[in-house]
């Protein structure tokens, strides 16, 4: 299978993690006080569990950890849903959250303290960082230069918490910004010093 091939590649390069994504997102998964009757996408969450369970078994056999990314168009689009997936699959040893705080902005999960508190107790596998400005009502996402998006102050608080809590995983920079000219290398160079200043040792 494709997953087994990727796990083999991870072993070859010495990666302890393999990234996975969950299926396309339904907007409302749970509800109360009438919403459970009229608004919830019934069965959408539970339907993904038997789809993902075999992947957990493959990871266990291979001795590797899967990292489910918080994607803005996926069923796991927040650290809350990432943690819930891990708990529902009883897979904390072989499934972690690959946290993209910028993606979580789309569902309005505040990176710090809310997002961090969901995953800090053994659920966090990897973090990758970019800065953004989201406008959910207009269905618009803008990647911003580090420090010019909506996450700058939260990044500082998060970095301090990671140091305080002795996080020993990787925090990587996701280089997806350009100034409008399509040149991602220039965008990288405009962002990397600020990234290192915040998240470096």
Predicted segments, located by residue:
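C-terminal helical cap(s) of enzyme catalytic domains, especially alpha/beta-barrels
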Residues: 182-201
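Residues that line or immediately flank small-molecule/substrate-binding pockets and catalytic motifs
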Residues: 22-25, 131, 174-175
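Gly/Pro-rich active-site loop or hairpin
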Residues: 75, 79, 83, 103-168, ...
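Conserved, mostly hydrophobic/aromatic
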Residues: 10, 66, 82, 100, ...
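Hydrophobic alpha-helical membrane-association signature
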Residues: 2, 48-51, 154, 187, ...
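Active-site acidic/histidine proton-transfer and metal-coordination neighborhood
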Residues: 1-97
């Amino acid at each position: 299978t494709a997953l087994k091939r990727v796990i083999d590649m991870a072993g070859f390069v010495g990666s302890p993690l393999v990234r996975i994504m969950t299926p396309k997102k339904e907007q409302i998964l749970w509800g109360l006080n009438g919403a459970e009757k009229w608004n919830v996408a019934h069965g959408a969450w539970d339907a993904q569990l038997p789809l993902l369970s075999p992947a957990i078994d493959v990871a266990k056999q291979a001795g590797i950890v899967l990292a489910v990314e918080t994607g803005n168009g996926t069923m796991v689009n927040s650290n809350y849903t990432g943690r819930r997936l891990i708990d529902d699959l009883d897979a904390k040893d072989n499934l972690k959250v690959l946290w993209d705080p910028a993606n979580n902005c789309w569902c309005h999960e505040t990176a710090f303290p809310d997002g961090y508190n969901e995953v800090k107790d053994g659920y966090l596998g990897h973090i990758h960082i970019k800065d953004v400005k989201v406008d959910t009502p207009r269905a618009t996402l803008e990647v911003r230069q580090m420090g010019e998006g909506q996450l700058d102050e939260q990044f500082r608080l998060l970095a301090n918490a990671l140091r305080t809590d002795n996080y020993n995983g990787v925090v990587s920079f996701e280089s997806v910004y350009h100034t409008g000219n399509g040149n991602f290398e220039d965008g990288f160079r405009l962002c990397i010093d600020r990234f290192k200043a915040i998240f470096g040792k």
